[in-house]
A protein has these predicted regions:
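Walker A/P-loop NTP-binding motif of AAA+ ATPase domains
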Residues: 1-141
Length: 141
């Protein structure tokens, strides 16, 4: 699921409310949280393996990525040290590892989803939720 809306609209609060309501464990894979941790390709593979295994053990679980559009940017700013495209190749593997029986949800939050590669959004078959403060608009992509 992708939550999209302007800064301060309550997207992150909605994710926390979902976690609270479901009693779900939150795994935050935001690029700024994992920068410098689990270095290299093997480190990232280990991180994703741990997140998949532990999220399935602690169901219900939510895997959360803030500023998700940065993962799929066409061109990353040279000043951005968080290496946001690090998850790009491995994120589909994470999604494929989840089955319909798993109570694990991947939620991305974005201020500007139009900045990412449109092909990725169209291939994801995800729901796009656009929030303008309290009003929510749900689109099925």
């Amino acid at each position: 699921m992708l939550l999209a809306g302007p800064s301060g609209a309550g997207k992150t609060m909605l994710v926390h409310a979902i976690c609270t309501e479901l009693g779900a464990t939150l795994f935050d894979l935001t690029a700024t949280n994992i920068v410098g941790k689990y270095p290299g390709k093997s480190g990232l593979n280990m991180l994703l393996h741990l997140v998949i295994k532990v999220s399935k053990l602690l169901q219900p679980a939510i895997i959360y990525i803030d500023r998700a559009e940065k993962t799929f940017l066409k061109k990353v700013s040279k000043t951005d040290k968080s290496d946001p495209k690090r998850l790009k190749k491995d994120l589909p593997r994470l999604v494929r590892s989840l089955t319909s029986e798993d109570r694990v949800m991947l939620i991305g939050v974005s201020r500007s989803p139009w900045e990412c590669e449109q092909k990725v959004i169209l291939q994801s078959k995800a729901s796009l939720i656009h929030s303008r403060n309290i009003n929510l608009t749900i689109y099925r992509v």
